[in-house]
């Protein structure tokens, strides 16, 4: 059982994979026939950027909303499905500071342990500080972007202006 992300890049049991991509790319992954053939758990935070984009004949997913990191940890520890997909929600990870940041690493360790028995995919639309901590423990990290985001175009270099001169020197 494997989900194909790109030619030569698969999500399979025994491997914890992190995917950073636009939501539409994950929708395409979720529409693969393998998702319907195997029990699939989809964990998301307060809201999902992906679930609303699925068509009406969406695959069968066991959905689990996790409002806190601790709820996410509990859901992952109880997971028995063949495929586990976690939608990263920066809203539940960003408030963690100081000693609470250890909880992020606990999530990463739990995802890695779960990958021994299931295909585990962590998805995020972009990287941030909390996600970087989760990426450290991933077996493979896939960044998938077809186009450059609109704001990523480098601004044109400005010409150097001549040194200012006083009015007396200009005349």
For each predicted feature, which ranges?
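N-terminal regions of ATP-driven nucleic-acid and macromolecular assemblies
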Residues: 1-171
């Amino acid at each position: 059982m494997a989900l194909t992300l790109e030619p030569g890049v698969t999500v399979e049991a025994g491997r914890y994979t992190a995917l950073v991509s636009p939501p539409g790319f994950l929708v395409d992954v979720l529409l693969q026939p393998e998702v319907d053939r195997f029990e699939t758990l989809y964990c998301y935070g307060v809201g999902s950027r992906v679930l609303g984009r699925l068509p009406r004949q969406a695959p069968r997913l066991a959905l689990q909303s996790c409002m806190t990191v601790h709820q996410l940890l509990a859901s992952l520890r109880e997971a028995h499905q063949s495929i586990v997909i976690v939608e990263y929600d920066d809203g539940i990870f960003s408030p963690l500071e100081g000693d609470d940041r250890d909880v992020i690493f606990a999530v990463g360790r739990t995802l890695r342990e779960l990958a021994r028995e299931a295909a585990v995919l962590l998805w995020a639309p972009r990287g941030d500080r909390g996600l970087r901590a989760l990426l450290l423990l991933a077996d493979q990290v896939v960044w998938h972007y077809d186009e450059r985001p609109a704001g990523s175009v480098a601004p044109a270099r400005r010409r150097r202006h001549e040194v200012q001169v006083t009015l007396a020197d200009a005349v």
